[in-house]
């Protein structure tokens, strides 16, 4: 036993390695690992933004709509992986404007739930919904949270049909004003705050769309309803190759 100990001591003196030559292993901690995990997880889901308009069933309270969506968001994120939902919902006397930001799967399930209610309930509180625009792979969010606000403004009517603007002009104005409103909220509403509440039309009255524009978009045939959108989304894409046409030959050579 003493021989082995003596041999080890001798080997230490003969094979002493310069510390500068040892390979350097990068050191990290648990916080860095969690941040890296969170960063990689965020990269798995691309962000999308969707603009929706529609009608509200008579005598529907803002509280009922708010509870419906909050429970729906929680249920989706509880059972499916995806991004949290941010956006803004404006409740007019008879219509609504809803902007949603989330991952593709989450938005898909939100529309799917609406279609299920629409088919099973003749008087569901949200009706005749239309998708005005769906923006894919957006770089950043416009909203930090999901807010809902009741809008109480005087009704402004569009001009007569002979002088009414085109659908392109109305859609452009719609998107321009909603983006300006989103930027205003981004600057004024802090993360974690309750949001503007029902005073939004007082904080930025010049950025609130008249309800008549929302009604105009709801009636436009150019926009798809959620059921048609989901049907197109699930429809397989069949690509006809040249070989499918040329071979087999319709007749013998």
Curated annotation (Swiss-Prot):
Among InterPro entries, the record links this protein to: TEX47-like
Database matches in Pfam families: TEX47 (PF24787)
Instruction: Name the domain of life this protein comes from.
Output: Eukaryota
- Report the PANTHER family cross-referenced here: TESTIS-EXPRESSED PROTEIN 47
In its UniProt entry, what is this protein called? Testis-expressed protein 47
Q: Which organism is it from?
A: Mus musculus (Mouse)
């Amino acid at each position: 036993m003493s021989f082995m100990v003596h041999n080890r001591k001798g080997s230490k003196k003969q094979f002493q390695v310069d510390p500068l030559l040892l390979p350097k292993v990068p050191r990290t901690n648990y916080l860095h690992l969690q941040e890296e995990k969170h960063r990689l997880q965020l990269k798995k889901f691309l962000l999308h933004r969707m603009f929706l308009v529609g009608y509200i069933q008579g005598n529907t309270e803002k509280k009922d709509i708010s509870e419906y969506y909050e429970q729906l968001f929680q249920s989706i994120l509880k059972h499916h992986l995806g991004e949290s939902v941010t956006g803004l919902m404006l409740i007019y006397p008879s219509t609504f404007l809803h902007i949603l930001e989330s991952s593709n799967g989450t938005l898909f399930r939100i529309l799917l739930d609406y279609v299920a209610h629409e088919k099973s309930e003749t008087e569901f509180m949200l009706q005749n919904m239309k998708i005005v625009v769906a923006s894919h792979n957006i770089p950043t969010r416009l909203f930090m949270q999901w807010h809902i606000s009741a809008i109480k403004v005087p009704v402004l009517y569009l001009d007569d049909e002979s002088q009414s603007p085109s659908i392109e002009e109305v859609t452009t104005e719609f998107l321009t004003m909603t983006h300006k409103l989103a930027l205003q909220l981004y600057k004024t509403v802090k993360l974690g705050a309750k949001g503007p509440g029902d005073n939004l039309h007082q904080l930025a009255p010049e950025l609130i769309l008249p309800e008549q524009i929302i009604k105009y978009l709801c009636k436009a045939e150019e926009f798809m309803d959620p059921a048609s959108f989901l049907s197109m989304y699930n429809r397989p894409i069949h690509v006809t190759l040249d070989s499918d046409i040329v071979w087999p030959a319709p007749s013998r050579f």
